[in-house]
Amino acid sequence: QVLAGADVVVDVSNSPSFEDAAVLRFFETSTRNQLAAEATAGVKHHVALSIVGCDRMTDSGYMRAKVAQEKLIKSSGRPYSIVRATQFFEFAKRIADEATDGTTVHLPHVLFQPMAAQDVSTAVCKVAEGPPLNGVVEIGGPQQFGFDDFVRHVLGAYHDARQVVADPHARYFGTELAERSLVPGAEARLGKIRFDDWVSQSKIAAVRA
């Protein structure tokens, strides 16, 4: 009944737990339930937000769960579009927190192409408004950085004194990264908001809050 009359369903849900078994159970159960409800309601387009490189980071339980979600969607027989996004600017400080040991942040110097959440939502909406792709589209930010360099810039912008060091063995979502694990391919749709502009707008918003 909740989906009665809906033409499109957009799934941007996330697991409350990142423990391997729990996150897999969440994405498999929620996706199966959504797809079944959509079939009953006659929904014409299932759109799911996923992660660029999830299929390249197989040591990560979270990424394996996202791949499992994608496989369920692809095999469902329902019209679908999967939007794989790079990491959001907004999560940079959380990434730093999880990679912190004392006063030092350990991150690998691999390519990183983050984007603003506003650009993510715009891209997802455009896909939802169009016909089902029955495939995957990648989206990313307009700039590439070294992963460690980007987080160093973020902490500097907010006068965070933690030191960021390049560590090739530092893990991200439980896995070591290759040079291009986190960046989209050449056909990716790119956002418009540059990092410096996002920082400026974020500081203005914080002052106004």
Predicted regions and their residues:
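A hydrophobic C-terminal alpha-helical subdomain
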Residues: 155-209
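Active-site beta-alpha turn of Rossmann-fold NAD(P)-dependent dehydrogenases/reductases
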Residues: 13, 47-50, 84-86
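Generic alpha-helical secondary-structure signal
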Residues: 2-5, 123, 153, 201
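Short, amphipathic alpha-helical "lid/cap" segments that border enzyme active or binding sites
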Residues: 35, 117-125, 192-200
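Soluble or luminal CAZymes and related metallo-dependent hydrolases
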Residues: 26, 30, 65, 190
